[in-house]
Amino acid sequence: MTDESIIIALINNCLNYLIDNSINDPVDILRYLQKNIVTGRELEMSSIETPTDGDTNFISVDRHELIETAFDEVGALTDLRPTLEVQFYGENAVDSGGPRKEFFRLILREIKEKYFEPIRPFAKMEDYETIGKILALSMLQNGKIPQFLDFSLVNELFESSSPSLVVLNLRKGLDSLARTLQGTHYLQKENIILRIVICVRSLLIGSSLPQFRHLFNTKQPVMTLKGAITMLKPKFSEPGSNKRSLETRVYSVFTKYLREVSSGRRENISLHSILMFATGADEEPILGFAVGPEICFSESETYNSFLPTSNTCIHRLTLPIPSAEKDLPTNEILFHLYDLAFANTYYGLS
């Protein structure tokens, strides 16, 4: 069986299942496609014990030259189905989900600014093909949805029989997950499916399920104080224990800090910054977190260790608590340490 035959069979199986089971919700469609398309290592860790074996597409990129290095690395990938594994130059994090989400967040922001504000029809067309690959990967691998695309551009991407050169090359990139298998005989079934797209064209149902397109134009709500407190669930010790008392004391200070951030009184820090520090993402992915973000507590032994730390692969924010040797600093000092941590954009903060 050829690679092309395998892809065609995969598309047919997904199509039949979606149609036969009347799955119309865009999020449910995306979840089903992710399950059946992405291969290799698990996209997310469900616990610290989750094995990290399995095939990946490994890329190494520079935060300071992200467009150039990412386009080189992603452009060289031939099979886009395996889980993407990202390493930033000079940083020591092992990617089990966190660095990948961080990569998608950063690269989509730069793509938006450089290529879509406004669209640059005279840019290198191969750039738009690589952009299409990145958009498809981001959607299928728990990254951000590309919600910066103009509504008319989304319609052209799905439906136009005479697209612009920019859209034509975006299609090529988006279609690369399915070897550009579009418009062939398997796309006919009771006139229900007019266009099958992988991510946005070769597998996801676009023309006959226009509600799917709203994923591209629906803006994520701004995170609120209530939303942040609800999302970052504290993991306390047993009630009545000395440790629980210390944890509650620190958590109370942290919620005060969240109020300061929410009110705009901590310069350059937002609630999104804190979520990003804990998870690698500045908003909840469209398919949700495999493991909900949580706050854990660890005993502090030195002054510097009152800095928060995180494990973005399991979405864990750790807040130090006082020990017998070291009492809790003042709120002013703690808030300053929290600022230092949450303003950090590099993996490997010590």
Description of each model-found segment:
Residues 3-141, 145-151, 267, 350:
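Hydrophobic, conserved cores of late-appearing folded domains
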